[in-house]
Amino acid sequence: MSSDGSAGKAVVEAKGLNPGLIVLLVIGGLLVTFLIANYVMYMYAQKNLPPRKKKPLSKKKLKREKLKQGVPVPGE
């Protein structure tokens, strides 16, 4: 009797992969593909896009910075 039970388990295991494992492999594969694609696009952008321009400082901020440094602001 015990030999029949173990043979039945062997047949079930030989049927195929666990569906949960297949789902994990698919999700893992998609995640790895996504990360690799992001890295490739990042490297492409670093080579081909011009560097970002700094935002222009407003007159108010320029005045404040000059006051901090002790430089007299013209017009005052």
Curated annotation (Swiss-Prot):
Region (Disordered): 51-76
GO cellular component: nucleus
Subcellular location: Nucleus
Keyword annotations from UniProtKB, A to Z: DNA-binding, Nucleus, Repressor, Transcription, Transcription regulation
Pfam families named among the record's database cross-references: S1FA
Entry's Gene Ontology molecular function annotations: DNA binding
GO biological process: regulation of DNA-templated transcription
InterPro entries: S1FA_DNA-bd (IPR006779)
UniProt feature, compositional bias: Basic residues: 51-66
Presence of the UniProt keyword Nucleus in the record: yes
Motif Nuclear localization signal, residue range(s) on this chain: 50-55
PANTHER family, per database record: DNA-BINDING PROTEIN S1FA1-RELATED (PTHR35298:SF11), DNA-BINDING PROTEIN S1FA2 (PTHR35298)
Family: Belongs to the S1FA transcription factor family.
Function: DNA-binding protein that specifically recognizes a negative element (S1F) within the RPS1 promoter.
Record-given protein name: DNA-binding protein S1FA2
